[in-house]
């Protein structure tokens, strides 16, 4: 895809769940012009390998309310950029504060008892963010650990999925191509083993 290429990723949870950035992430994002991380880093130092590829912008996620972030709480909640004629907004997608932490717990419980799924979570987040940021042409979010691409009116909403996936999830990143009047997304599965603190292949925590 021609144009300005943005690498997208979210929910890496390094070093609490993954020890370091998986090589598959660096391979998938090699050659991009810019990288956006949509929250739950957890330690901003984990972004350094990405900076060797391209400039990086990152936002904080819901995990930072628990003081597990090793400085991640200092990251901004929202970043807005003008890229190739598109206004791109980056945020984690969670409700802020203690309410967001409580709602996330309810959502995880509902998924465990099969009252809802991550696709529905993305659907709800997209419909909350689109009217909240009407000036944005592209909204990039994370939080659900599940990829999502949807257009609501003129807006493109993208969740690249999670790098730190649970045993039931496929880890993914994304590449967003922007040119004048055009925005396209490729979701990229990560097939190589992750370097996890808990299992040989995937993170094994149900908490997001």
Whereabouts are the PLM-identified features?
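Short amphipathic alpha-helical segment that frequently serves as the phosphate-/nucleotide-binding helix
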Residues: 21-23, 173
């Amino acid at each position: 895809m021609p144009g300005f290429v943005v690498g997208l990723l979210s929910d890496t949870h390094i070093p609490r769940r993954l020890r370091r950035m998986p090589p598959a992430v660096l391979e998938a994002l090699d050659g991009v012009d810019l990288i956006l991380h949509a929250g739950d880093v957890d330690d901003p130092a984990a972004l350094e390998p990405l900076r060797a590829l391209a400039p990086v912008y990152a936002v904080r996620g819901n995990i930072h309310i628990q003081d597990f972030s090793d400085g991640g709480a200092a990251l901004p909640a929202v970043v807005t950029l003008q890229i190739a004629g598109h206004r791109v907004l980056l945020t984690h997608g969670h409700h802020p504060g203690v309410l967001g932490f409580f709602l996330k717990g309810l959502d995880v419980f509902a998924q465990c008892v099969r009252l809802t799924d991550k696709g529905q979570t993305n659907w709800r987040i997209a419909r909350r963010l689109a009217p909240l940021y009407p000036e944005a042409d592209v909204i990039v979010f994370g939080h659900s650990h599940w990829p999502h691409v949807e257009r609501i009116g003129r807006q493109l909403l993208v969740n690249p999925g999670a790098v730190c996936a649970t045993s039931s999830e496929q880890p993914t990143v994304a590449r967003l191509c922007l040119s004048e009047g055009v925005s396209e997304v490729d979701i990229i599965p990560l097939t190589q083993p992750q370097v996890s603190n808990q299992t040989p292949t995937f993170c094994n925590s149900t908490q997001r």
